[in-house]
Curated annotation (Swiss-Prot):
Keywords for the protein's UniProt record, in alphabetical order: Cytoplasm, Fatty acid biosynthesis, Fatty acid metabolism, Lipid biosynthesis, Lipid metabolism, Phosphopantetheine, Phosphoprotein
PTM notes: 4'-phosphopantetheine is transferred from CoA to a specific serine of apo-ACP by AcpS. This modification is essential for activity because fatty acids are bound in thioester linkage to the sulfhydryl of the prosthetic group.
Keyword Membrane attached: no
GO cellular component: cytosol; membrane
UniProt-listed Gene3D superfamilies: ACP-like
Source domain of life: Bacteria
Family stated for the protein in its record: Belongs to the acyl carrier protein (ACP) family.
Associated pathway: Lipid metabolism; fatty acid biosynthesis
Location(s), subcellular: Cytoplasm
Xref: SUPFAM superfamilies: ACP-like
Designated name of the protein: Acyl carrier protein
Positions of modified residues (O-(pantetheine 4'-phosphoryl)serine): 37
Amino acid sequence: MENIEQRVKKIVAEQLGVNESEIKTESSFVDDLGADSLDTVELVMALEEEFECEIPDEEAEKITTVQQAIDYVTAHLKK
């Protein structure tokens, strides 16, 4: 099974139409990967579906980089 980081990067690549090799953990969805506000909403929805968790809007707004998405999922999967 893929680890969380690999799964998050795969989702980001699919949602934003970027090559997985271009995605680094410090990549910003908007500044580095060209996402707009709709992309980020769809990305959060894809993460929720993949990891079967709910990400409240106020938390989703704080997730702006790949690493923040990985950290959020990691923290909330263990609960």
